[in-house]
């Protein structure tokens, strides 16, 4: 089950809660994609509700989305300074902290709609700190945390895969991250005994597909690249992934 906040509205919240709880009861994989969680209080409150009521096997988002989740676990009433979007629908105010949320030092969230804030970008210079923060959040939430961007991080709180696959054009394709969350869910469901490795493989796969799409589309533009990306995902196999995956474990 992949719970995605991308097209969130009031009516979808009970459905996501019920689906998540039932998936937990049945022992099915549940993944959270907190799309644009830092963009409005409505999205933040919904994410808080889901984190409190549903046990997630993995959470995948860009760095700003993950940092916002971390700030929610740290201080429930904390607001982002970049909350430029306001949803008109209200949700019931949450007054109880989730048992698995606690103060996470050094992590604060900002957002730019569904895009990562440039100031949050994971770079070689700040990589060690981001790895530390990601591991801390993973331990607090007791779930795999996958942070995707120019450098991808996938951690279970103990080990962290640092993945360097991908192409800058992927950031110009709306829905590429959501596509990855679907792939991640499928990989986890197929490999329930090796969830960290499965999550890392999913992220590597999407990055490899992005590289192959860039080779195929050349300078044709983002429309051609989008189609080439979907083609590359559909044509991916184990051999291509093994040859193309670039990662280290820290």
Question: Where do the PLM segments sit?
Answer:
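Short, small-residue alpha-helix embedded
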Residues: 68, 174-204
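Short, structured active-site "lid" loops
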Residues: 1-11
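Short, well-structured alpha-helical segments that form the helix of a local strand-helix-strand
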Residues: 133-138, 195-210, 229-230
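Charged C-terminal helix
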Residues: 208-250
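Short pre-catalytic strand/loop immediately N-terminal to key active-site residues, enriched for Gly-Thr
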Residues: 163-175
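Glycine/small-residue-rich loop that forms an oxyanion/phosphate-binding "nest" at active or ligand-binding sites
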Residues: 12-61
């Amino acid at each position: 089950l992949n719970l995605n906040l991308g097209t969130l509205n009031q009516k979808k919240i009970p459905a996501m809660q019920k689906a998540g709880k039932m998936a937990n009861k049945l022992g099915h994989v549940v993944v959270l994609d907190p799309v644009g969680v830092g963009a409005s209080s409505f999205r933040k409150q919904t994410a808080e509700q889901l984190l409190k009521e549903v046990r997630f096997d993995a959470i995948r988002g860009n760095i700003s989305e993950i940092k916002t989740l971390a700030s929610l676990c740290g201080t429930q009433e904390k607001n982002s300074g970049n909350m430029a979007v306001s949803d008109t629908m209200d949700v019931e105010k949450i007054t109880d902290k989730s048992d698995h949320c606690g103060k996470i030092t050094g992590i604060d969230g900002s957002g730019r709609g569904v895009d990562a804030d440039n100031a949050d970008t994971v770079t070689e210079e700040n990589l060690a700190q981001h790895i530390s923060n990601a591991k801390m959040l993973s331990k607090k939430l007791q779930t795999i945390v996958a942070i995707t961007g120019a450098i991808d991080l996938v951690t279970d709180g103990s080990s962290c895969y640092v993945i360097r696959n991908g192409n800058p054009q992927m950031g110009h394709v709306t829905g590429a991250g959501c596509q990855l969350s679907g792939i991640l869910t499928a990989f986890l469901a197929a490999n329930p005994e090796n969830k960290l490795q499965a999550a890392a493989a999913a992220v590597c796969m999407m990055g490899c597909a992005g590289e192959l799409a860039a080779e195929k589309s050349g300078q044709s533009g983002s429309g051609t690249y989008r189609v080439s990306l979907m083609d590359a995902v559909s044509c991916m196999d184990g051999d291509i992934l093994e040859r193309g995956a670039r990662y280290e474990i820290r």
